[in-house]
Amino acid sequence: MPVTDSIADFITRIRNAGSAKNKTTDIPYTRVRENLSKLLVEKGYIQNYTVIKTEADKFPFIRVELKYTADGRHAIKEISRVSSPGRRVYQGKDIKRYLGGLGLFILSTSKGILTDKEAREQNVGGEVLFRIY
């Protein structure tokens, strides 16, 4: 079954794997999902990710290693989609902070996928993909 919103699927797979206390989750590969995984590793929300392409599998996938705190709680307290295919949400250069700077907005900009802080520093706006805390 085709996925109409690959970013929402990415977010849901990570959220569900964290709720189930899984160490890893596999996500079908797209370049955007790989860039999002890279950003989440840089910001400390996931442990690591690996792109896996085998000859037996027709399609590559991303294996995401989730991160947990010392007491076993998922490092991501909240992750939710802001913009969707039916309702795009754009933010100009004056991007507000999420939860006073504790959380992040992830934006798709002309300079690539950036956090709200990076977009403010580079003075660019874009589509708000999701928020994470």
From Swiss-Prot:
**Gene3D superfamilies for this protein:** 3.30.1370.30, 3.30.1490.10
Which Pfam families does UniProt cross-reference here? Answer: Ribosomal_S8
Q: One GO cellular component from the entry?
A: ribosome
**Annotated GO biological process:** translation
List UniProt keywords, sorted A-Z: Ribonucleoprotein, Ribosomal protein, RNA-binding, rRNA-binding
What Gene Ontology molecular function terms does this protein carry?
rRNA binding; structural constituent of ribosome
State the InterPro entries in the record.
Ribosomal_uS8, Ribosomal_uS8_CS, Ribosomal_uS8_sf
Q: Give the protein's function.
A: One of the primary rRNA binding proteins, it binds directly to 16S rRNA central domain where it helps coordinate assembly of the platform of the 30S subunit.
Q: How does it assemble?
A: Part of the 30S ribosomal subunit. Contacts proteins S5 and S12.
Q: Which family does it belong to?
A: Belongs to the universal ribosomal protein uS8 family.
Which NCBIfam families does the protein's record reference?
A: PRK00136.1
Protein name from the UniProt record = Small ribosomal subunit protein uS8
Q: What is the lineage of its organism?
A: Bacteria, Pseudomonadati, Chlorobiota, Chlorobiia, Chlorobiales
